[in-house]
Design a protein with these regions (language model features):
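Contiguous, small/hydrophobic- and glycine-enriched helical/loop subdomains that border
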Residues: 100-103, 133-154
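DPxDG-like acidic metal-binding loop motif
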Residues: 28-31, 115-141
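FAD-binding core of FAD-dependent oxidoreductases
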Residues: 17-21, 26-30, 118-122, 160-171, ...
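C-terminal nucleotide
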Residues: 3, 7, 34-79, 83, ...
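Short alpha-helical patches at coil-to-helix transitions and adjacent helical residues
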Residues: 9, 82-85, 121-128, 167
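Short pre-catalytic strand/loop immediately N-terminal to key active-site residues, enriched for Gly-Thr
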Residues: 108-115, 282-284
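Glycine- and acidic-rich phosphate- and metal-coordinating loops
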Residues: 89-112
């Protein structure tokens, strides 16, 4: 039996713009997905996922004559949850040169699904790592991140960025711009507060919407480039000896405004952003694809957390420190 875990993430800056070659800075947070894998004697795959904010399910498939898993859950749940796990299994089998290996897989996560916190990336990273090691092969972090990205890229119909999977694999604050992917070293404390509206945006649709806007309007393309310029300034601040939280927060506020202009915010997200700002946060913005899900605030006091607890439409609020660990080989 082999266990791996990987962290979720928030975007400090740069979501959506990263799809077009601009830099982004995602940061790993101390909420994780854990995947336990045990090899079977046959070629079937059995997945138990009873802690994915989805009511839980168990599914088994594989073997001659089985074209798809059978389970008593809605089709969209099957597609959302199983697409990533199925891709992780395929990547692990390929990495270990074990195309017919059967696996028992248990998935646990304290990262809300579809909320902009990198839940799918964390599950895929931890899943590939645990399954590959259970099948007797080793995998380097860089190769793991690339394989995990290939899974997300396929499941999201080519709309995915490598930022989520790279951040989940490496941990800490990272910079991603095309093929240039690296950790930002010696980043100080980043006191994040996350607000969650209980919803989930459709990443593929939101990314496609920004693409359409960018293709039709010069000002939208300029907005994407402005996000890239903002990220570069933020990265410079992160690399300093004393991280100026007030300046970082100001850039987060600006970034949220640009994302709103691109049409990816939502009323619930804006309400949480303003609640955090008015309670004294250095800055706040949506994180991830948008359309619903989460916001992230930068606040070293209890103000934002308390304000979000009482904000209509905010189902959960929690503190989330920067997690300097990426994938963990737990057993």
């Amino acid at each position: 039996m082999t266990v791996s875990s990987a962290p979720g993430k928030v975007y400090l800056f740069g979501e959506h713009a990263v799809v077009y070659g601009e830099p982004a800075v995602p940061c790993a947070i101390e909420r994780r997905a854990r995947v336990t894998v045990e090899r079977r004697d046959d070629d079937r795959v059995r997945v138990n996922a009873d802690d994915l904010s989805l009511d839980g399910f168990t599914v088994a498939w594989g073997g001659e004559g089985d074209d798809a898993p059978e389970l008593d859950v809605p089709t969209n749940l099957l597609e959302a949850a199983m697409g990533y796990i199925d891709g992780a299994v395929a990547q692990a089998r390929d990495a270990a040169d074990a195309p017919d290996a059967g696996l028992d897989i248990t998935v646990e996560s304290d990262i809300p699904l579809g909320a902009g916190l990198g839940s799918s990336a964390a599950v895929v990273v931890a899943g590939i790592d645990a399954a590959t090691r259970e099948l007797g092969a080793a995998i380097a972090d860089e190769a793991l991140a690339e394989r995990a990205f290939q899974v997300e890229h396929e499941v999201q119909d080519g709309q995915a960025s490598p930022a989520d999977t790279f951040c989940s694999t490496m941990g800490g604050a990272v910079r991603v711009q095309g093929e240039d992917r690296r950790r930002i070293d010696d980043v100080g404390s980043l006191p994040f507060v996350v607000g969650y509206d209980g919803g989930a945006g459709d990443t593929g649709e939101l990314v496609a919407g920004v693409r359409d806007l960018r293709d039709r309007h010069v000002f939208a393309a300029d907005t994407v480039e402005a996000i890239g310029d903002l990220v570069r300034e933020g990265e410079t601040l992160l690399r300093g000896e004393d991280t100026p939280l007030d300046e970082l927060g100001g850039l987060m506020n600006f970034n949220h405004g640009l994302l709103s202009a691109l049409g990816v915010s939502a009323r619930s997200l804006d309400s949480m952003v303003w609640a955090a700002r008015e309670s004294g946060a250095y800055g706040a913005k949506l994180t991830g694809a948008g359309g619903g899900g989460c916001i992230v605030a930068l606040d070293d006091s209890e103000g934002s957390k308390t304000a979000l607890d009482y904000t209509p439409g905010c189902e959960e609020a929690f503190r989330a420190e920067l997690d300097t660990d990426g994938v963990r080989r737990e057993s």
